[in-house]
């Protein structure tokens, strides 16, 4: 339990940031799941559109520090490869 005034403030800030990050992480997962669902359905057009919407979100989360930039690149590369395989 936080005893000093500054420790209490830091605890409040930490909780606020945790909730904000959880919301953003959930949004990121939702966008990625939409792409995966379209790929599993075999719908190339929908998958491409969902990927186009998800790509800037993934990049933004990497910029904000929510996920590592390499993880963002890996997400995008793997999803894009699956979409290209769907077209072939």
Swiss-Prot record:
Keyword Transferase assigned: no
Spell out the molecular function terms from Gene Ontology.
Answer: small ribosomal subunit rRNA binding; structural constituent of ribosome
Cellular component, GO, one term: small ribosomal subunit
Q: Where is this region: Disordered?
A: 1-27
Report the leader peptide range: none
Q: Please, one GO biological process term?
A: translation
InterPro entries in UniProt: Ribosomal_bS20, Ribosomal_bS20_sf
**Record keyword Cell division present:** no
Q: In terms of domain of life, where is this protein from?
A: Bacteria
What UniProt keywords are attached to this protein's entry? Ribonucleoprotein, Ribosomal protein, RNA-binding, rRNA-binding
User: Mind telling me which NCBIfam families this protein's record contains?
Assistant: S20
Q: Which family does it belong to?
A: Belongs to the bacterial ribosomal protein bS20 family.
Describe the function of this protein.
Answer: Binds directly to 16S ribosomal RNA.
Protein's name according to its UniProt entry = Small ribosomal subunit protein bS20
Provide the species name: Shewanella sp. (strain ANA-3)
């Amino acid at each position: 339990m936080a005893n000093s005034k500054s420790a209490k403030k830091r605890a409040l800030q930490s909780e606020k940031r945790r909730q904000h990050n959880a919301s953003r992480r959930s949004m990121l997962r939702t966008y990625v799941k939409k792409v995966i669902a379209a790929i599993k359905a075999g719908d190339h057009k929908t998958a491409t559109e969902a990927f186009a919407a998800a790509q800037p979100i993934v990049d933004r989360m990497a910029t904000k520090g929510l996920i590592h930039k390499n993880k963002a690149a890996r997400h995008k590369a793997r999803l894009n490869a699956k979409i290209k395989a769907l077209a072939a």
